[in-house]
C-alpha cells in the first residue's frame, strides 16, 4: 500500500496508525521493525519524522497458519453473525496462549468451535481477538471472524467509539458520586509484569466512573473506558486510593470477603457493526461470584 504524508513532523508509526481502518500503533511499529515499511524508498524507522509529500509504502504479510491445539470447552456466546461474535468470558479463563497456558485458553476454545472462521490480523497466538480482558476479569469480549471485521472493530477501539462499560467493587467508600481519572499508564519501572501511572513514557489513559451503591467499607461502581490500556481500571482505581476488591497485585495483599482476584466484570459492549454501521449493544448480567459479594455487603450494612 502506498500513502503520502500530509503533515510535517509526524512520526512514521503514528502516521500509519491514524489511517482509517488501518493498523494499531504497536502493529505499525512491528511492521517497521521487520523492514516492511519504506519512506521515499528507504527502510523507515518508527521515530522518523515525515515531511509533507513523503511517499510511505508498506506491506502487511499474510497471516501465519495457526499452530494452536483446538480444545473443546463451553463458550457463552451472547451475540453472533457472519462477521463477529461476542463472548461472555468467565473469570479465570486466559484469553490467549502463554507460558503455562498452551491448550486451555479462550483462543483454544474458539479454534475448536470456529476453526478457520477467525481473523488472522493479530497473529497466530491471537486469532480473532480484537481486544483483551484480564484472566480474572469476567465479561464481554469481541471476536472477529474475518480480517475486514477485525480492521473495522480495531479502528473503533482506536478512535474511542467502541463503548466498554465495567462493573467493579472497590475498597473504601467513595465520597463523590462520579468522576474521571485522566492519568497516563506505562510499564512499572521495577516490576515488568505490572503497570503504573507515570508521566515518563506513559500513554494517555482515561477512565470515567460513577457510584452504583455504597456499602460499609466498599463501593460498587460502574466504569466507562475512554482508552484501553493494560490493567487500566485496576491501575486507575488503585491510583485514586480505591483499589479493586480482591486485586492483590494493585491493592490489598490479603483476600477480603473470600475474593483472591479482582471483582471486575465487563458488563456492556456497544459498537457499530463493521459491515453496515448499525449499532450493536450487548450486555452480560453480573456473574454469580459478583452477586455473592454484593449479598455479603448487603448483610454487613
Model-derived regions, located:
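Pseudouridine synthases involved in rRNA/tRNA modification
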Residues: 1-27, 75, 190, 200-206, ...
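RNA pseudouridine synthases
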Residues: 1-180, 184-189, 283-296
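Thr-Gly-centered strand-to-loop micro-motif
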Residues: 39-40, 96-97, 144, 195-199, ...
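Short alpha-helix capping/helix-loop boundary micro-motifs
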Residues: 40-45, 217-220, 255
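Short, surface-exposed secondary-structure edge patches
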Residues: 45-49, 222, 261
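Residue-level recognition of well-ordered beta-strand positions that form the cores
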Residues: 59, 169, 184, 210, ...
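Short flexible coil/turn linkers enriched for glycine and charged/polar residues
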Residues: 81, 135-136, 162, 203, ...
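Short beta-strand micro-motifs in enzyme catalytic cores
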Residues: 85, 166, 219-221, 267
Amino acid at each position: 500500500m502506498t500513502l503520502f504524508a500530509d503533515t510535517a513532523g509526524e512520526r512514521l508509526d503514528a502516521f500509519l496508525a491514524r489511517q482509517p481502518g488501518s493498523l494499531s500503533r504497536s502493529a505499525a511499529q512491528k511492521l517497521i521493525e521487520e523492514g516492511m515499511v519504506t519512506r521515499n524508498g528507504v527502510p523507515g524507522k518508527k521515530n522518523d519524522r515525515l515531511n509533507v509529500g513523503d511517499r510511505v509504502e508498506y506491506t502487511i504479510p499474510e497471516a501465519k497458519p495457526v499452530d494452536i491445539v483446538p480444545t473443546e470447552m463451553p463458550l457463552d456466546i451472547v451475540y453472533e453473525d457472519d462477521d463477529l461474535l461476542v463472548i461472555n468470558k468467565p473469570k479465570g479463563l486466559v484469553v490467549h496462549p502463554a507460558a503455562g497456558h498452551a491448550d486451555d485458553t479462550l483462543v483454544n476454545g474458539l479454534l475448536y468451535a470456529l476453526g478457520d472462521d477467525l481473523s488472522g490480523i493479530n497473529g497466530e497466538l491471537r486469532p480473532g481477538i480484537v481486544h483483551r480482558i484480564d484472566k480474572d476479569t469476567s465479561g464481554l469480549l469481541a471476536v472477529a471472524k474475518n480480517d475486514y471485521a477485525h480492521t473495522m472493530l480495531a479502528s473503533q477501539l482506536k478512535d474511542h467509539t467502541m463503548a466498554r462499560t465495567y462493573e467493579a467493587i472497590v475498597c473504601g467508600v467513595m465520597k463523590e458520586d462520579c468522576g474521571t481519572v485522566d492519568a497516563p499508564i506505562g510499564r512499572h519501572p521495577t516490576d515488568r509484569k505490572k503497570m503504573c501511572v507515570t508521566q515518563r513514557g506513559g500513554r494517555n489513559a482515561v477512565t470515567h466512573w460513577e457510584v452504583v451503591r455504597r456499602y460499609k467499607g466498599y463501593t460498587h461502581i460502574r466504569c466507562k473506558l475512554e482508552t484501553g490500556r493494560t490493567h487500566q481500571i485496576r491501575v486507575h482505581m488503585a491510583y485514586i486510593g480505591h483499589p479493586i476488591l480482591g486485586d492483590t497485585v494493585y491493592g490489598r495483599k490479603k483476600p477480603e470477603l473470600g475474593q483472591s482476584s479482582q471483582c471486575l466484570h465487563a458488563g456492556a459492549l456497544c459498537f457499530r457493526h463493521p459491515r453496515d454501521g448499525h449499532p450493536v449493544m450487548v450486555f452480560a448480567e453480573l456473574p454469580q461470584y459478583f452477586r455473592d459479594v454484593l449479598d455479603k455487603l448487603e448483610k454487613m450494612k
